């Protein structure tokens, strides 16, 4: 879980525009109480540094539903700026 947080922070700060303040859309499945609270820490830090965080939460399936949503966004040519994804799952996107 710590690796996921570090990956999200890294993506948040490297996937943004520097012209009008960083803006990021994050697809994730952290929707339960404790998960949402942990994600709020990242959101608040990003906002405190002038960023605009746009949530794309996907509930259910322990990330499986989020992976389906991510694939659909990629195929449609509208991927989010960052996505919470399990390490081995990213390899599936390379095969398509």
Protein language model regions, located:
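Generic anion/oxyanion-binding catalytic loop in active/binding sites
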Residues: 9, 28, 71
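Short, surface-exposed alpha-helical segments at coil->helix boundaries
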Residues: 36-40
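Sec-dependent N-terminal signal peptides
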Residues: 4-14
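Residue-level marker for beta-strand->alpha-helix junctions and adjacent short loops that shape enzyme
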Residues: 11, 31, 89-90
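Extracytoplasmic "Venus flytrap"/periplasmic binding protein-like
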Residues: 22-24, 41-96
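Short N-terminal segments immediately surrounding and downstream of signal-peptide cleavage
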Residues: 22-34
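Sec/Tat signal peptide C-region and signal peptidase I cleavage site
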Residues: 16-20
């Amino acid at each position: 879980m710590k690796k996921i947080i570090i990956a999200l922070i890294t993506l948040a700060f490297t996937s943004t525009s520097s012209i009008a303040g960083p803006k990021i859309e994050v697809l994730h499945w952290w929707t339960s109480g404790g998960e949402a609270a942990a994600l709020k820490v990242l959101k608040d830090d990003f906002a405190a540094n002038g960023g605009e965080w746009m949530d794309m939460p996907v509930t259910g399936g322990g990330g499986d539903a989020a992976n389906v949503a991510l694939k659909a966004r990629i195929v449609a040519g509208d991927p989010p700026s960052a996505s919470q994804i399990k390490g081995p799952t990213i390899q599936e996107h390379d095969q398509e």
